[in-house]
């Protein structure tokens, strides 16, 4: 699991989800992630440097760290998210060094997307 590298770096992000197929469809459609299934209750996702997994379990969308993804074009990725059924919970806003917005996925996890463009 993950890519071997330096000690002490974050290597993997895992989401407990209620439906692995739905999560694969959502993230694959919007972000073009690729998947490797490891049995019926675990699926690894990868895209570039990012590695993580979906595991069947109790969904806990609140109280964890905020996962922030990057996109060159925020408006384009926001449109793709909305078409895939995501809810935009914080619209695009500017901050020193870039812009970002927050959305919730099908299991209710809140994630953000940022850009320096």
PLM features: what roles do these ranges have?
Residues 1-24, 65-67, 117:
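N-terminal beta-strand motif that seeds the catalytic metal site of vicinal oxygen chelate
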Residues 11-14, 93, 112:
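Residues embedded in well-ordered beta-strands within globular domains across many folds
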Residues 19, 48-49, 58-59, 71-74, ...:
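Short loop segments at secondary-structure junctions
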Residues 23-27, 81, 108:
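Conserved active-site tyrosine of GNAT-family acetyltransferases
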Residues 31-37, 87-92:
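Short secondary-structure junctions
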Residues 33-65, 111-115:
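Conserved short beta-strand elements that form part of the metal-binding/catalytic scaffold
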Residues 68-107:
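Vicinal oxygen chelate
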């Amino acid at each position: 699991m993950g890519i071997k590298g330096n000690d002490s770096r974050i290597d993997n992000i895992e989401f407990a989800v209620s439906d692995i197929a739905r999560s694969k469809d959502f993230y694959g459609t919007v972000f073009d992630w690729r998947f490797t299934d490891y049995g019926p209750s675990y699926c690894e996702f990868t895209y570039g440097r990012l590695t993580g997994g979906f595991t069947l379990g109790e969904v806990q969308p609140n109280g964890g760290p905020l996962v922030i993804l990057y996109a060159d074009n925020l408006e384009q990725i926001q449109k793709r998210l909305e078409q895939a059924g995501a809810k935009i919970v914080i619209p695009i806003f500017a901050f020193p060094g870039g812009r970002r917005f927050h959305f919730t996925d099908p299991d209710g996890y809140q994630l953000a997307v940022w850009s320096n463009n």
